[in-house]
């Protein structure tokens, strides 16, 4: 089995800290699958100011030929297209092209991604064809121990735009990582622990060496499955902001989520947020 992609080394911790917290917005998602495998996905978001944004996306996956195609259209009038090929040119090689186009402004992007997976190394390269920028990363792994690096290069300016490095350990039920990002100026240590089949815990500590405040930020989170259809999550950071969420599958294909964010340093002020998430699938 190949080591994870560089961007996914901290995935377990990041998902625990960032996903399933619908605060400050109302989220709606409707996903349906046709008999021929075509998937339709409509998603919408209304923020605290009442601004609504959304996207309609259609995708198709031809597993026999390793082909995936998707087309999306957003309420910002942006067309998003993705085409991917897997395992067609070499074992473990994945290729995809992502493009966007705005009919109103003629703004466009075109990004080519190449990814290769090997039992000992996972490599990835991304080329922004229009802006002439390159991003590359790799992860090497052995018996759960991981090491990786990332760097960006601006062809027009002829210089390295950014670089980062990560070391970690990943073996169920534990994951730990130490990352230096933003040109090795921001340091982050994180952990994830599946305590039991029902309980997950994780957190991170971050230090920005370039910041004049010289402060360390801390964030902790946990998830508890009440039953197979219901779970609750909670997190709190060093600024005293606590966030809670509750998700329940009320019936097959229908999931409801509630979120609440409290600023414990300003309990008597209007600094708190609530949110709702509705997801339908068929």
Curated annotation (Swiss-Prot):
For the keyword Nuclease, the answer is no
Domain of life of the source:
Eukaryota
GO BP terms, alphabetized: inorganic anion transmembrane transport; lipid transport; mitochondrial transmembrane transport
A GO CC annotation recorded here is:
mitochondrial outer membrane
Which Pfam families does this UniProt record tie to the protein?
A: Porin_3
Q: Which GO terms describe its molecular function?
A: ATP binding; porin activity; voltage-gated monoatomic anion channel activity
Intracellular or extracellular location(s): Mitochondrion outer membrane
Q: Which UniProt keyword terms apply here?
A: ATP-binding, Ion transport, Lipid transport, Membrane, Mitochondrion, Mitochondrion outer membrane, Nucleotide-binding, Porin, Transmembrane, Transmembrane beta strand, Transport
Query: Which residues participate in ATP binding?
Result: 11, 19
Lyase as UniProt keyword? no
Q: Which PANTHER family match?
A: GH26960P-RELATED, VOLTAGE-DEPENDENT ANION-SELECTIVE CHANNEL
State what this protein does.
Non-selective voltage-gated ion channel that mediates the transport of anions and cations through the mitochondrion outer membrane. The channel adopts an open conformation at low or zero membrane potential and a closed conformation at potentials above 30-40 mV. The open state has a weak anion selectivity whereas the closed state is cation-selective.
Show the domain comment: Consists mainly of membrane-spanning sided beta-sheets.
What the record says about family reads: Belongs to the eukaryotic mitochondrial porin family.
**Can you say what this protein is called?**
Non-selective voltage-gated ion channel
């Amino acid at each position: 089995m190949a080591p994870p992609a560089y961007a996914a080394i901290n995935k377990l911790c990041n998902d625990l800290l960032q996903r399933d917290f619908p605060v400050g917005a109302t989220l709606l998602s409707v996903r349906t699958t046709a008999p021929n495998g075509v998937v339709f996905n409509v998603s919408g978001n209304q923020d605290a100011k009442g601004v609504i944004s959304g996207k309609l996306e259609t995708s198709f996956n031809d597993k026999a030929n390793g082909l995936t195609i998707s087309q999306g259209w957003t309420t910002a009038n942006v067309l998003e297209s993705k085409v991917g090929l897997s395992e067609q040119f070499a074992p473990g090689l994945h290729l995809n092209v992502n493009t966007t186009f705005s009919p109103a402004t003629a703004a466009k992007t075109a990004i080519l991604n190449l990814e290769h997976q090997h039992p000992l190394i996972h490599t990835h390269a991304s080329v922004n064809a229009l802006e002439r920028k390159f991003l590359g990363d790799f992860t090497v792994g052995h018996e759960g121990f991981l090491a990786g690096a990332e760097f960006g290069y601006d062809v027009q300016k002829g210089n390295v735009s950014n670089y980062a490095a990560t070391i970690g350990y990943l073996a169920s039920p534990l994951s730990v990582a130490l990352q230096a990002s933003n040109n090795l100026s921001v340091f982050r240590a994180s952990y994830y622990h599946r305590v039991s089949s029902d309980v997950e815990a994780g957190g991170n500590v971050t230090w920005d060496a370039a910041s004049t405040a010289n402060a360390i930020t801390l964030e902790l989170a946990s998830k508890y499955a009440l039953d197979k259809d219901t779970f609750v999550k909670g997190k709190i950071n060093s600024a005293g902001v606590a966030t809670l969420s509750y998700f329940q599958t009320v019936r097959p294909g229908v999931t409801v989520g509630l979120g609440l964010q409290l600023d414990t340093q300003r309990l008597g002020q209007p600094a708190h947020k609530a949110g709702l998430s509705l997801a339908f699938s068929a």
